[in-house]
Structure formats: structure tokens, C-alpha cells
Amino acid sequence: MTLADLDEIMEIEPVAFGSHHWSRQSFANELGNLGGHYYVACEPTDGRIYGYSGFWLIGEEAHITTLAVHPDYRRMHAGERLLLNDIYYANRVGANWMTLEVRVSNETAQKLYLKYGFKSLGLRRNYYQDNSEDAMVLWTENIHDPDFKALVRQRIAELKEIHLFAIDPFPEDKGGATTRAAESKSPESAESSPQMEV
């Protein structure tokens, strides 16, 4: 994600999150945060952005801060592939765990995360400012644990069965290189803000 993506991001954000959504300035601030890692999903034909996600790296924890898909692309596994992208980059920058908060009413998102081995650690009461809704706190086991990797790879195999590409978050297991240190980023750097075609 870059500053140039924000016009398209701001078309999706209020539709995805309603009145309690990030502002354009919030995204701009996040792109200047060296601990922030943000990515977009775009159409391979015309480059149109239809989803995005990202996380903060805090020590060994990748804290997912956003994941959104344009309504026209829902129920097409776009959110699932964005989550796989986050797991891939969390691994690359040295995270051992992943966590997030999700509204207790957002059962669709909860099902996605639970499908990928996230577990509920409890609730944050009155977490959301717009309506004082509680947030469910979700957390993974160590993402380098063989059982977690096996679960993720099973989900990738299921996507491949329906002819969808999905990135393997753990290429080092197959002899590929991986970066284990956090990468320095600038908001305008295309190299540090890749666009994922899903």
C-alpha cells in the first residue's frame, strides 16, 4: 500500500466498516509507521484495488489492524487470501504470533480467523467507540509450530482445489529464503509496499 492507493482505499473503507472507519489521515499516518505493514489486493487486468490488509509488528507479535474487501469481491476467498498474505509477511519480518480484535457481531470475520487456527482469548469490553460493542481478542499459537503450518497448508490446498492461487507463508520450509528482521519502509516505496494480485 502506498499514499497513491488511498483514493481507492477510501472508497472501500466506509463500506466495509461503516461509521467507525479509519480516515484518510489515519491511513497516511500508518504508512509512515515503520512498524506497520500494509498491502493491497488488486485486479491483475486493470490494477483496481478491491481489498487490503495490514498489521503492526510489535516485538514478536503481528497485530492485524485491518482487513477489508470490497462487497463485490466477497464470498470469493479474497479475505482468506489477504489473511494468508499477512501470515506470509508476518513470517518474513520475524513475528512468532498473530493477534487481532474483532467485533463480537462480526461472525463472518470470526469464522475466517478460527478457520486459520486463531483462538479466542476473551473479550475487551466496550472496545468500539461508535456503539461500545465488545471486541473478541483472537490469537494464534506460534506460527512456526508444525501444527499451525500444517493447518495453513491444508487451507491452501483447499483453495487450489477450486483453482485459486494462494501464497505459501512458509517458503523457507521448501528451501526458499526468508527475511527475519523488520524491514525499513517509506510510504512511497513500491518495493516495500507490494501489491498482491488475488
Question: Which ranges hold each PLM region?
Answer:
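Conserved GNAT acetyl-CoA-binding A-motif
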Residues: A90-E101, R124
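Residue-level recognition of the GNAT/N-acetyltransferase active site
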Residues: T2, H70, R74, R103-S105, ...
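Conserved acetyl-CoA-binding loop-helix of GNAT-fold acetyltransferases
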Residues: V69, R75-Y88, E107, K111-K115
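Non-catalytic, surface-exposed connector residues within folded enzymatic/regulatory domains
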Residues: H21, M76, D130-S132
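Conserved catalytic-core motifs of GNAT/GCN5-like acyltransferases
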Residues: E101, L114, K119-M136, F148-K149, ...
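Methionine-biased hydrophobic packing positions in alpha-helices, especially
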Residues: M1, M98-L100, M136-L138
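Acetyl-CoA-dependent GNAT
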Residues: L3-A4, M10-D72, L83-V93, E141-D145, ...
